[in-house]
Amino acid sequence: MTKQTLTQLEQHDLFLRRHIGPDSNQQQAMLNFVGAESLEDLTAQIVPESIRLSQDLSIGDSCGEAEGIAYIRGLADQNQVFKSYIGMGYYGTQVPNVILRNVFENPGWYTAYTPYQPEIAQGRLEAILNFQQVSMDLTGLDLASASLLDEATAAAEAMALAKRVSKAKKANIFFVADDVFPQTLDVVKTRAECFGFEVVVGPASEAVNYELFGALFQYTNRFGQITDFTELFATLRAKNVIVTVAADIMSLVLLKSPGSMGADVVFGSAQRFGVPMGFGGPHAAFFVARDEHKRSMPGRIIGVSKDARGNRALRMAMQTREQHIRREKANSNICTAQILLANMASFYAVFHGPDGLKTIASRINRFADILAAGLQAKGVSLVNSTWFDTISIKGLDVAAVNARALAAEMNLRFDADGTVGVSLDETTLRTDIEALFDVILGAGHGLDVAALDAQIVSQGSQSIPAALVRQDAILSHPTFNRYQSETEMMRYIKRLESKDLALNYSMISLGSCTMKLNAAVEMLPVSWPEFANMHPFSPLDQAKGYTQLIEELSTWLVNITGYDAVCIQPNSGAQGEYAGLLAIKKYHESRGDAHRNICLIPQSAHGTNPASAQLAGMQVVVTACDKQGNVDLDDLKTKAAEVAGNLSCIMITYPSTHGVYEESIREICDIVHQHGGQVYLDGANMNAQVGLTSPGFIGADVSHLNLHKTFAIPHGGGGPGMGPIGVKSHLAPFVAGHVVVKPGRESDHNGAVSAAPYGSAGILPISWMYIKLLGSNGLKKSTQTALLNANYVMKKLSEHYPVLFRGRNDRVAHECIIDLRPLKEASGVTEMDIAKRLNDYGFHAPTMSFPVAGTLMIEPTESESKVELDRFIDAMVSIRAEIAKVESGEWPVDNNPLHNAPHTMADIMDPEFDTRPYSREVAVFPSAAVRTNKFWPTVNRIDDVYGDRNLMCSCAPLSDYE
């Protein structure tokens, strides 16, 4: 008979115990090793007393998985998912179950990281290369990115690219056609204001009347009209105007490509290629440009290179354009994109193939033809004379139509001028068309779908003008014509997955990235139709479940951060930085201080910080760090005083990017405030703050939170992410608003930073579940365990590698940096060699050469057990012994298992291997753990220089398949 209490038997803390890697016995052993009596004792040794919270969080108690699921099921049931015909960039779609089950719900795909280590990421790199090929084929242009955040932010990136590359250097006007989606215009205006661009909005034909550097057109437009822009684009390009086009990906299956009309840049949302609406996201945007603009492209680009054996291998190309290298001179601040969703869209194209896509697109268009024919037969006037999927109607009794629509549980588009819009999609059925006739015309209309279809087949359709019907073939590569059976598709997805190392195989200890557990129970609600299938512009009274979830999550985040308000809209951490800086900018402007435009940034900052400051129209001034990695207070005081009249803010990270809690953090905040500036605290390292301290308590004014780091949203192989911002009350009126959905906040009048009002709302249930299940105590214990794991790893490795930075009591925060520069100097072994050798041991390398070149930054998170930590430590110790053999001369510098890493099956099958000074066993089975569970890299070390000098960012030529 157990003596446990009923409360103990109910196991309300079971999720907490499963989320945290080390069990109680392991924790005690680790505490003993690092020299602490308890987690509280360790916390007291590490976190400065002056910033330690005296009270616990007020989130509530932890709860069990069943209880959490029951509660969020109640929220989901409050959402009324009506049939949506709103369109405007968001459409119903059928997610193929083979993709839903094997990609979207598969940790092998959603727990991987951005493929900075391409040798162990060849699977998702191939999937993204497929996405780029789809984008290029459909748009008719030369070079595609790996994905952007959404269609509206892609439009803003297109505008920025246009300014960079246009030969009309004196022009400062960007023209936007007045029939683009309103949310796109909203985001473009927000970005243009920061850059000092003038945005002119008008009919497309009027673009020729202005001196422009760029112009934006919608194809098809918001009303459904399809326009042949060939002559207009030629006229504009003759005037050195960069022509950008927002295009509907499904319509491009049937329509003449914008590239063939003369467009320079084409972008849009890939959402309707098998990705649910999710109340606004996440969705991947495609972005394609002419080859001549490749150096000015934003975001990730996947390219083809070769490995050390000369075999074809994939990698991220032209990274010198990006924020982690070019900082404030980068083309964009993009870090996290939407790789998981781009993968889904690419698999959708692979699974359906060109014929299947044409059938789907043709069916959508046929239903639109039938709807239009029936309405016109009853004397209804249409706004548009051509269409792919959208019919816009004028002259209706809007109130009556809306009442009938709501009674039939459907949402139409109602414009302010009385126009009613209907956008059809892949999910539309015959019965839906019949219901639409009833709603628009009232009962007794006598229309018959079959008869109307027969009429269209007999007479032909003019909805797509003959000159705009696509004539060229699309998706002719074998990849898009070979996997149309589910068996083959399932195996193709599995084959790619097996090439990638993700959290479902081993720890990914990337510093500043927080690769923690993404628990299955947290992921479950994301697939529920009540969350997945809601249109972001649905009436808010139909989204009561989402509204309550967002309100509860926001309240929790306010408590966790110590701020007064939260804005959920930014759909990545970098977007959160941009949104936070905009709030600061608008705050200064409201006080008559528009001249305050200088942003102080420590030299150790993340690359997104200076890139975001530049994006917000600020001037970056770099402040020095001392030998301990802390902000140099003397330099900060000097520079803050020098720029005091124009100081806007400082951007700092806490704990610092060097992995320590700076004792002077409050003094840093005070210095900036005394000179009239605001404090932006980067939330990248929030996993070392939750429950112990907070940005608001420290003295910051605004922060973004990486929900895909601290709050358990998976990284998805490079996205999705979420970057909501927390602000003090004086900044709350200046956070992002939205032109379409206005929930009644004081910031509603502000411009948007993302296409959807709540950003990627579809993944918010993950963070809601994470916080709900852990509760106040669990959140704090997670942070404390992250500190324990990091200090355990640090102390173990310090016996073999120098640790670069430590804080009070020789402790680190949640991550540590080991210095490889002395070893490199003594042996010739580089940090790259060690990173690639870790692949042979079954590990993704820690963060390399950030924030200091020649180092590795290790962040184990709270989710890794002592067993896994010891396996990683053993690998690093073994690698140190291998380096010693190079130092001693036993192995040549240019022929050893580190220099030749990673090793593949082809290596050990090669008869030439016998000429190497080490055995096959040393190459591929360097530890006992690897012998029982081996991850095989599928390519050898990739030649980055070759890839950039011979740029190829599309699927292999057909000759490779012959």
UniProtKB/Swiss-Prot annotation:
Modification N6-(pyridoxal phosphate)lysine occurs at: 709
Record carries keyword Oxidoreductase: yes
Annotated GO CC locations: cytosol; glycine cleavage complex
Name recorded for this polypeptide: Glycine dehydrogenase (decarboxylating)
Matching NCBIfam families: gcvP (TIGR00461), PRK04366.1 (NF003346)
SUPFAM superfamilies named among the record's database cross-references: PLP-dependent transferases
One GO term (biological process): glycine decarboxylation via glycine cleavage system
A Pfam family reported for this protein in Swiss-Prot or TrEMBL: GcvP2_C
Alphabetized InterPro entries for the sequence: GcvP, GDC-P_C, GDC-P_N, GDC_P, PyrdxlP-dep_Trfase, PyrdxlP-dep_Trfase_major, PyrdxlP-dep_Trfase_small
